[in-house]
């Protein structure tokens, strides 16, 4: 038996050896004959093979330097429909593989930072008001540059918003006009804004010209055509959308439970034929006429009667019974179904009204989805599951509804209430892509105050901002830096500035004192300053203008800043109490001198008053505590025009700081104690401090109020009637039981 096995193994080995020699010999002969041909061709002056010619060739899997358009055309015929083949040269599909890494030149942004250039408007070109607002928002931003050599991003002055060929706003011959721009460079580093694309009957997303490698900031863009980390999805907004500012959200107070008269509402057109008609034609199945009110009308378009169905008359009658605004403000959820295009005006209307949007538009890339978590503010539905929508929203807990409603208000006010905010959000998203090492995270974008007011260039650590202490489980700062703004020379040891310096230095919370010397006279000698237990740093301003008091000096070592005018009169106890109050409200201005604003109906302008009334809206920075971050925001967020105005007038810097902080926090400042007089009355009338007694000084502040309100687009100041006093303040109890007992004597 074993002999048979041995014979079988030998026979198998011999057969394998014979096969190996046979096939190997064939390949060897083929190789030799090929070699002879190559050698013969070499003798005749033809191609001579390289030494590594016979090594096997493998395709380069990485191919790091393949042009983007070559990648685009590669395997283009695989897995595409006949329609896609017909449209292969249209702008819908060209550049579909573009990403920041392949179609954006980062080197333009390294030298000068993120600067945006807007092409000059060409003669005879019509521009719609909405596009004018977009361009104005860019030109008024801190990103704008008029020098194309300094630019990182380019925006066309040609109106690209409405690319519906049936629209009167449609710009003809845009393809040739764009190609003739000398900076176009096939769209590289360009941003194109678009609200409407395509036309009847299919409303494709074709913008009608080759966008090349340009980015799209587009409304109603589908997830299929959206290029992640390259395009930006923006909301569809009307031509009446405000350019700046915008109305605040309509949620004035939180009701518990958060349920309203209607559970779910919608009022809009019903499309009888064509794209977008399926969902709206089926809404009547869900409508119950009680807490679910979904109304549609057939009365729109020129030939609606030609296509009207048996339900049209009944739907039109029901449609007229309800007021849309009344429904919107009294509904818990608002249905946002797709129209002819994926986006809808109902989306922004629902956000502003604190009506939780129920999205019913399959395939829509939601606005700013790259940074906004829409699950915190909306219910994402499915058109195929329309009949399940009512039961789904009824199952949502009341706590969740309240959280959704509050988030709608935050998102509306932070990113959508004006054209300017929509444009700036778009630019900030692109800037975060370019400078990823200092980009904002999801918490910043989805928590108050939002991504537009939190500048990552200030710090990459959230604990350095005053808004996230609770989220991070951090305590507010335990020390402050006193910054004293000095504008008069030292001529006497009894001057108020020296008394103020000593009082601030005695505070248990004081880490250091900075004297900002904005006086025309030279710095006094060191021995002229009093000895203190904390360091005293004297900084001489280079420009010596009013805005210099709010520069983000590196010398400020604490997050808390006690801002003081040189003639302020405060005791150590008052400083301590104000700081302990600020620790509970680190995002606000906390201090002593309060002022207010009002609307003057006779002059139709804002007014400024220092009269003592039952409310206030400003706390002046002559004796106030706030977070150091507001120095950075004042210097880098506000436009140069406002700061130049402050410097020229040598006035209004404290008002501008109050405008800024109220715009960020949406909250009023906090006044402490009932103290009214905070200035030294014995200051010499020849000093610059006597400007407070100058009537022109007060008139300038009136003018400043209106200029600031015009730039912000609304009045950000908020009135408050709250004043914080120490516990047992003025109570008829023993003085020994009171912590801040000296305050009552002042």
Curated annotation (Swiss-Prot):
Pathway stated in the Swiss-Prot or TrEMBL entry: Protein modification; protein glycosylation
Subcellular location(s) of the protein: Golgi apparatus membrane; Golgi apparatus, cis-Golgi network membrane; Endoplasmic reticulum membrane
Recorded GO MF terms: acetylglucosaminyltransferase activity; glucuronosyl-N-acetylglucosaminyl-proteoglycan 4-alpha-N-acetylglucosaminyltransferase activity; glucuronosyltransferase activity; heparan sulfate N-acetylglucosaminyltransferase activity; metal ion binding; N-acetylglucosaminyl-proteoglycan 4-beta-glucuronosyltransferase activity; protein heterodimerization activity; protein homodimerization activity
Glycan-carrying positions: 89, 330
Cytoplasmic topological domain: 1-7
Keywords, alphabetical: Disease variant, Disulfide bond, Endoplasmic reticulum, Glycoprotein, Glycosyltransferase, Golgi apparatus, Hereditary multiple exostoses, Manganese, Membrane, Metal-binding, Signal-anchor, Transferase, Transmembrane, Transmembrane helix, Tumor suppressor
Keyword check for Manganese: yes
UniProt-reported outcome of changing residue 567 to N: Decreased glucuronosyl-N-acetylglucosaminyl-proteoglycan 4-alpha-N-acetylglucosaminyltransferase activity
Positions with a binding annotation for UDP: 267, 269, 271, 280, 319, 324, 346, 349
Effect of residue 280 to A: Loss of N-acetylglucosaminyl-proteoglycan 4-beta-glucuronosyltransferase activity
Binding residue positions for a protein: 166, 203, 300
Keyword Zinc-finger (UniProt): no
Name of protein: Exostosin-1
Native source species: Homo sapiens (Human)
Lineage: Eukaryota, Metazoa, Chordata, Craniata, Vertebrata
């Amino acid at each position: 038996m074993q002999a048979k096995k041995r014979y079988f193994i030998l026979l198998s080995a011999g057969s394998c050896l014979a096969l190996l020699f046979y096939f190997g010999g064939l390949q060897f002969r083929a190789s030799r004959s090929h070699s002879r041909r190559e050698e013969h061709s070499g003798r005749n002056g033809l191609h001579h093979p390289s030494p590594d010619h016979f090594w096997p060739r493998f395709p380069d899997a990485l191919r790091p330097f393949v042009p983007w358009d070559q990648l685009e055309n590669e395997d283009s015929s695989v897995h595409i429909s006949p329609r896609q083949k017909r449209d292969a040269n249209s702008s819908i599909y060209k550049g579909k593989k573009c990403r920041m890494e392949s179609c954006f030149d980062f080197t333009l942004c390294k030298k000068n930072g993120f600067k945006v250039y807007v092409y000059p408007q060409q003669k005879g070109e019509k521009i719609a008001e909405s596009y004018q607002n977009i361009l104005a928002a860019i030109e008024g931003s801190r990103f704008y540059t008029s020098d194309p050599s300094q630019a990182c991003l380019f925006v066309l002055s040609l109106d690209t918003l409405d690319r519906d060929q049936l629209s009167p706003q449609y710009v003809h011959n845009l393809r040739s006009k764009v190609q003739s721009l000398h900076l176009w460079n096939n769209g590289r580093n360009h941003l194109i804004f678009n609200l409407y694309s395509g036309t009847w009957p299919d409303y494709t997303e074709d913008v009608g010209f080759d966008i090349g490698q340009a980015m799209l900031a587009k409304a109603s863009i589908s997830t299929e055509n959206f290029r992640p980390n390259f395009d930006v999805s923006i909301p569809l907004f009307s031509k009446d959308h405000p350019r700046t500012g915008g109305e605040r959200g309509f949620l004035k107070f939180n009701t518990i439970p958060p349920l309203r008269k209607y559970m779910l509402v919608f009022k809009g057109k019903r499309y009888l034929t064509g794209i977008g008609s399926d969902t709206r034609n089926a809404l009547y199945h869900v409508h119950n006429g009680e807490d679910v009110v979904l109304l549609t009308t057939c009365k729109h378009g020129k030939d609606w009667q030609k296509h009207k169905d048996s339900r049209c008359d009944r739907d039109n009658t029901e449609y007229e019974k309800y007021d849309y605004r009344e429904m919107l403000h009294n509904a818990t959820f608002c249905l946002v179904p797709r129209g002819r295009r994926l986006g809808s005006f109902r989306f922004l209307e629902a956000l502003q009204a604190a009506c939780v949007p129920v999205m019913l538009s399959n395939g829509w890339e939601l606005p700013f989805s790259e940074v906004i978590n829409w699950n915190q503010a909306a219910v994402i539905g499915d058109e195929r599951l329309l009949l399940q929508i009512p039961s789904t929203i009824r199952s949502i807990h009341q706590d969740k509804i309240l959280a959704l409603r509050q988030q709608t208000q935050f998102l509306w006010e932070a990113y959508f209430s004006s054209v300017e905010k929509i444009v700036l959000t778009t630019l900030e998203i692109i800037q975060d892509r370019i400078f990823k090492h200092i980009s904002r995270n999801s918490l910043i974008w989805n928590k108050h105050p939002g991504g537009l007011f939190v500048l990552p260039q200030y710090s990459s650590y959230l604990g350095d901002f005053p808004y996230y202490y609770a989220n991070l489980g951090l305590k507010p700062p335990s020390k402050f830096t006193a910054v004293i703004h000095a504008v008069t020379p030292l001529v006497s040891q009894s001057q108020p500035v020296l008394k103020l310096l000593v009082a601030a230095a005695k505070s248990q919370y004081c880490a250091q004192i900075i004297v900002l010397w904005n006086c025309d006279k030279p710095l006094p000698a060191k021995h002229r300053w009093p000895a203190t237990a904390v360091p005293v740093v004297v900084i001489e301003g280079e420009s010596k203008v009013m805005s210099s008091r709010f520069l983000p000096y590196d010398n400020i070592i604490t997050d808390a800043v006690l801002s003081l005018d040189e003639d302020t009169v405060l005791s150590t106890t008052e400083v301590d109490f104000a700081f302990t109050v600020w620790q509970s409200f680190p995002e606000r201005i906390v201090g002593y001198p309060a002022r207010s604003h009002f609307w003057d109906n006779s002059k139709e302008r804002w007014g400024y008053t220092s009269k003592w009334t039952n409310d206030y809206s400003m706390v002046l920075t002559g004796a106030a505590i706030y977070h150091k971050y507001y120095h950075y925001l004042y210097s880098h967020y506000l436009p140069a025009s406002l700061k130049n105005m402050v410097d020229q007038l040598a006035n209004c810097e404290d008002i501008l700081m109050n405008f800024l902080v109220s715009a960020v926090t949406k909250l009023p400042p906090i006044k402490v104690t009932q103290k009214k007089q905070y200035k030294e009355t014995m200051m010499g009338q020849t000093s610059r401090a006597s400007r407070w007694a100058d009537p022109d000084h007060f008139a300038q502040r009136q003018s400043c109020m209106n200029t600031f309100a015009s730039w912000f687009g609304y009045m950000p100041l908020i009135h408050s009637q709250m004043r914080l006093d120490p516990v047992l303040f003025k109570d008829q109890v023993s003085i020994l039981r009171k912590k801040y007992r000296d305050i009552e004597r002042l």
